[in-house]
């Protein structure tokens, strides 16, 4: 059911991109361009989603001799989860955050910021890395990257057309264009894309948290890490293209009155509460083994 829901939401994002092209560019030409753009965006996201996301945050590939402790922790967790070793990247930022990307476990990558490596104790770092491995195991990375790429394409299209209206008005559109519809789409298309992203991202964070907690056996360590990361994000948010925010373990802060509606993640406190509840369950059943969720 979750896979069907995700496929439906990605289909709606593609349809939104096609509809946006029709409304923004005008007429049948806009429709044809939208279909082509949607096809190219999905194909590009399939093959290059990892590089697109990593480039968005200027992540730099690191070798085992450059980050031996990071490699050792990820390798141990990957073996425990029966996953291939992902490529590891470090983001040159003092903000504390992390994400995973890649179309499948064989093409996966994990990126962490310099700030996260400096800030977290060993057990909490392990929890964060396990969370990212959980996204890889649960095949969330491709879904999130495709959604981010589609949303980014919609936002870019709307922005380009808004510039066109600003400088040239509606004179450049053909007879089939609808200036009022185009103006509405400039506002509504990116907003709708964001809302569809929410439907894809929110439930996956809970699942990745639980998978990570079972993998490490330390739900409290991940809960403490989330608390630290949330506090850090309020003071020092990681920049980058907002379309890729759903990939991050902690959502960048937004205005308080919009937070519940437009955040791509469930609230950090809800995630912490679930982890602490899971800790109680694991303590009552100490022999429970890690399983793929």
From Swiss-Prot:
Places the protein is found: Cell inner membrane
This protein's UniProt keywords: Cell inner membrane, Cell membrane, Hydrolase, Membrane, Metal-binding, Metalloprotease, Protease, Transmembrane, Transmembrane helix, Zinc
Required cofactor names: Zn(2+)
Transmembrane segments: 7-26, 30-49, 148-168, 180-200
Membrane topology: Multi-pass membrane protein
Cofactor binding mode and count: Binds 1 zinc ion per subunit.
Active site positions, chain numbering: 132
EC numbers: 3.4.24.-
Binding site for Zn(2+): 131, 135, 205
GO terms, biological process: proteolysis
One CC-aspect GO term: plasma membrane
Pfam family, one: Peptidase_M48
InterPro entries (alphabetical): HtpX_protease, Pept_M48_protease_HtpX, Peptidase_M48
Any one GO MF annotation of this record: metalloendopeptidase activity
PANTHER family: PROTEASE HTPX
Family: Belongs to the peptidase M48B family.
UniProt-listed HAMAP family: Pept_M48_protease_HtpX (MF_00188)
Name of the protein described by the UniProt record: Protease HtpX homolog
Encoding gene (name): htpX
């Amino acid at each position: 059911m979750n896979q069907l829901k995700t496929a439906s939401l990605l289909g709606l994002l593609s349809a939104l991109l096609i509809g946006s092209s029709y409304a923004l560019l005008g007429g049948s030409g806009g429709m044809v361009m939208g279909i082509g753009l949607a096809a190219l965006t999905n194909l590009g996201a399939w093959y290059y989603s990892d590089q697109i996301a990593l480039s968005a945050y200027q992540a730099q590939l690191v070798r085992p001799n450059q980050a031996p402790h990071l490699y050792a922790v990820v390798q141990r967790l990957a073996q425990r989860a029966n996953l291939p070793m992902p490529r590891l990247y470090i983001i040159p930022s003092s903000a504390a955050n992390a994400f995973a990307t890649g179309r499948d476990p064989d093409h996966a990558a994990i990126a962490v910021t310099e700030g996260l490596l400096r800030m977290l104790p060993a057990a909490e770092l392990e929890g964060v890395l396990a969370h990212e491995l959980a996204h890889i195991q649960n095949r969330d990375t491709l879904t999130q990257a495709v959604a981010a790429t589609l949303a980014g394409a919609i936002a870019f299209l709307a922005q380009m057309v808004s510039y066109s209206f600003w400088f040239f008005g509606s004179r450049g559109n053909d007879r089939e264009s609808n200036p009022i519809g185009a103006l509405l789409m400039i506002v509504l298309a990116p907003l709708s894309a964001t809302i569809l992203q929410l439907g894809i991202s929110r439930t996956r964070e809970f699942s990745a948290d639980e998978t990570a907690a079972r993998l490490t056996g330390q739900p409290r360590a991940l809960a403490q890490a989330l608390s630290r990361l949330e506090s850090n994000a309020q003071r020092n948010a990681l920049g980058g293209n907002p379309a890729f925010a759903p990939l991050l373990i902690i959502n960048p802060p937004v205005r308080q009155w919009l937070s519940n509606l437009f955040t791509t993640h469930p609230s950090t406190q809800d995630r912490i509460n679930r982890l602490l509840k899971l800790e109680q369950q694991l303590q009552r059943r100490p022999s429970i083994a890690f399983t793929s969720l």
